[in-house]
Amino acid sequence: GILLDKLKNFAKTAGKGVLQSLLNTASCKLSGQC
């Protein structure tokens, strides 16, 4: 249903956000710019 679709989209968006921040943290640590 609609609720399930909303939950799926939310999970996708949240997952992307987490991945993005992990990547940002990793790259700043590697370059020593944290």
Swiss-Prot record:
It holds the Pfam family Antimicrobial_2. Shows antibacterial activity against representative Gram-negative and Gram-positive bacterial species, and hemolytic activity. GO terms for cellular component: extracellular region. Keywords: Amphibian defense peptide, Antibiotic, Antimicrobial, Cytolysis, Disulfide bond, Hemolysis, Secreted. The keyword Nucleotidyltransferase does not apply. Belongs to the frog skin active peptide (FSAP) family. Brevinin subfamily. One of its GO terms (biological process) is defense response to bacterium. This is Brevinin-2Ec. It is found in: Secreted. Expressed by the skin glands. Disulfide bonds join 28-34.
